[in-house]
Each structure stands twice: as C-alpha cells, then as structure tokens.
Design a protein with these regions (language model features):
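Conserved HGGG/HGGXW glycine-rich cap/lid loop of the alpha/beta-hydrolase fold
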Residues: 38-94, 99
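Conserved hydrolase catalytic core segment
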Residues: 120-163
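Flexible "cap/lid" loop of the alpha/beta hydrolase fold
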Residues: 148-186
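Short beta-strand/loop motif that positions the catalytic acidic residue
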Residues: 252, 258-260
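Acidic catalytic loop of the alpha/beta-hydrolase fold
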Residues: 263-267
Length: 311
C-alpha cells in the first residue's frame, strides 16, 4: 500500500514538472519577448499592448519585424499586438533547407504559431509581402481569420510588372528619386548583409510620397538587425514555387480592409484594386500623399482606419 502511494506521489510530481515545463496560454501571450521552436525553426516574437489580439505579419524576404513594431506602436493603446520575425529573418532561425523559404512555408508557420498561442481565430495585419503571407493564410485557413488588414500588400502570383514600370516612369524626371531609380535599375547581387542593407537604403526614397520628410521618420523605426541576404536569395530563388493566390481570393471569408498609398510603386493601387475585386467582403481605402509606409506619411488617417476596422 505504501509502495503504491509512493508511486502515485512520484507520478504526480513528474506530471507537475512536465506541465510546468510547457508554457501555459497566458505565459505564451505575456507581454515581452519570447522564443519558441516549431517544425525545426526557432521563432522570435513579442507581445505588447492591451485589448483584442492583432497579429502583425512582417515580410518574409529578409527584413525583420522591428520597423513594424516601432511604427505601429500607437496601436498598442487599443490592441494586444503580436509581432514576430519570419523564418530566416532577424532573430528567427533559418530552416534546415533553404528550399523551405517559400510564402507557403511561411503561411504554415503562421498556422503553427496560431495553435501554439492558443488562438481560436485571429485578426491579421500584413504589410507588403507580409500582406501576401496574410492573404495566403486567409485562403488556406479561412476559418481561423476573424479580420484581415492588408497594408500596401502584394499578391504572390500576380504579375504587377507593368504597373510598377508605369509608376517608375512617372518619377524618372523627379530629382528626389533620380539616385534611387539609378540604383534600382543597376545590377543587383549583394553578397553580404551590409551590401543588402546599403542597397535598400539607396532605393528607399522611391517608397515615399515625400522622401525628404518620410525618410528620417522611417529611420527612427527601422532599428532592428540588418536584413538577411541569405533569406533574400533563398526567397527569390528562380526555381522557388509561387503560392497560388490570385485565383483563390474568393476563398477568403473574413471582413477585409485594404489600405494603399496612392504613391506606392512597389505594391501599386492597381494591385490593391485587384485584391478588392477578388475578396467579396472587402473595402479599399486609397491614401493620398502616401507611399509604401502610410503609418509614417499619413499616420492619423492610417491609424483611424485600422482602429475603426479592427475594434
């Protein structure tokens, strides 16, 4: 009898230790920085703010989430924001095989994180290629998306080359963009993170309606690790399969807000209009006097739209 009681006590202790070693839901979403390993990738994420959960989806080609964490901080007064670095970028680790740097891989990463965080469904905000990841997620996992905010987003398999070229041509005689266009049209094959960072800084004026005022404000938010040239080359590999999004937008069930700067050349208004036509429960807002980063150039209008939608 004593042996049985002792065995039961030992088992109880072991179970208690095992349970204590697994983060509980409230710990996983406690304010602060966290790491978790899922499917062979160690993800960094940060939780900040108060209110309903809003997951911030960063791009997946080598930049981290720092520019969003700093730039979108005013939303923390209204929402609990979860920021995370995508696989291979910033503080998250590389996948074992560089072939697994596709948008589809990142969509599945987000689903693993949703389950890990214990969220029944999410409101997602994706910027730029982060918007393409959010689109892919809402297509593949429509039941788990409560609301979708797409900010200057692209579509993974949409050919926007003509739209982009038209936007560049409209700026070619503007001295504010002369050096950026020259860099954009030159040979580009960075070998180091430093070279990649230098290139991005040279072309960055093109991403603003008014670079003279926009660039210094953006620089204050872009304080994270250097962009990863490894992630860029792995993501941009010519044989990398594209996720089929363009013909599947009608699978998205969530209410969707689409925001785009009228002066955005990389994710132009024409592409945003294409997204609106494909998602039945969507609304498009074109923001005047803004390029690719509307929270920098038209912050009051941008935050008002997001708060009104996501609340």
């Amino acid at each position: 009898m004593k042996k049985a009681a002792l065995a039961l006590l030992v088992l109880t202790v072991k179970l208690s230790v095992a349970q204590a070693s697994v983060p509980q839901p409230d710990e996983k979403l406690a304010a602060g920085e966290h790491y978790t390993e899922l499917a062979g990738v160690k993800f960094w994420y940060k939780v900040a703010g108060r209110g309903p959960v809003l997951v911030i989806q960063a791009p997946g080609w080598g930049v981290g989430s720092e520019y969003l964490r700093n730039g979108l901080a005013p939303l923390e007064q209204h929402f609990t924001l979860i920021y995370y670095d995508t696989r291979g970028s910033a503080r998250s680790s590389r996948p074992p095989d560089e072939k697994h740097m596709t948008t589809a891989d990142m969509v599945d990463d987000l689903e693993r994180l949703r389950r890990f965080w214990g969220l029944d469904s999410m409101t997602l905000l994706g910027h730029s290629h982060g918007g393409a990841i959010a689109l892919g997620y809402a297509i593949r996992y429509p039941k788990f998306v409560h609301g979708l905010v797409l900010v200057d987003s692209n579509i993974e398999d949409y050919d926007d080359g003509a739209d982009r070229n038209r936007e560049i041509a409209a700026r070619k005689n503007d001295p504010r963009f002369k050096d950026a266009i020259a860099s954009m049209t030159s040979d580009f094959d960075p070998k180091t993170d430093e070279q990649f960072d230098s290139f991005l800084k040279r072309v960055l004026p093109l991403y603003f309606y008014e670079p003279v005022s926009g660039l210094p404000r953006f620089a204050k938010t872009d304080t994270g690790p250097l962009p990863s040239v490894w992630a860029y080359h792995a993501f941009a590999a010519p044989d990398k399969p594209l996720m089929k999004e363009d013909g599947s937008l009608d699978r998205i069930e969530a209410q969707t807000l689409i925001l785009v700067g009228r002066a955005d050349w990389i994710c132009p208004v024409a592409e945003a209009e294409h997204i609106r036509k494909g998602i039945r429960n969507s609304r498009l807002v074109v923001l005047d006097k803004s390029g690719h980063f509307p929270w920098i150039e038209v912050s009051e209008r941008f935050f008002a739209e997001v708060i009104r939608f996501a609340k």
